[in-house]
Amino acid sequence: MVTTQKLKAATNTARARGERTRQAILKTAVDIASAEGLEGLTIGRLATKLSLSKSGLFAHFGSKEDLQLATVDAARSIFIREVIRPTFEAARGLPSLWQLCDVWLGYVQRGVFRGGCFFAAAAAEFDGRPGPVRDRVAEIMKEWLATLQRAVIDAQQERQLATDIDPAQLAFEINALEMGANWAFQLHGDKQAFTRARDSILERLRRGSTKLGSTLLPSLKEKRKSGKARK
């Protein structure tokens, strides 16, 4: 006789198995989308690659758009793990801001995503295509700019950056330099782009830093050592 406890255990096992399958699907989807674009994702392609039935994939994602949105969110989780969390131990203010910049460049440099920055690629693919996928990518890009802006404000409150600096402007400049490095590396294979970006960001931070703040930024030698360690 099947007891309630056994039914519950069987249900939990099935759910766990289903979640493992979903995560395996998303891992493959992120890898494909990072290099070939979100439009390169199809239920049929993933089913073949993972040796699953199409109906099995439809059980997890009812449409291509659902799959794309889930893939974007999976990439966001990876980004948080690889870029945001490593900065938690940095001191508030300029050390944290510089760490965000350095780790972001390192995440592209290390090839966390096969196609460089996942969100730079997704933004280029969907920026002229209104809809839920574009909206989600835009929302995540805004989160990143807000994170940089918050770090700038923290540095100003700690009296490490000049208070006449516009946080939104500085965040925009940093992001532009990072995106430029990603573009140069992906399109031209220019590994020096990361050094140039780090030099430019560090110079911009030094230019806006107070006397206290300037002592918290790495020297050129330390910065280059950091960049080499991430290759």
Q: Across the structure, where does each feature detected by a protein language model lie?
A:
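Hydrophobic alpha-helical connector segments
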Residues: 70, 84-115, 167-174, 216-221
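Short hydrophobic/aromatic patch on the recognition helix
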Residues: 50-61
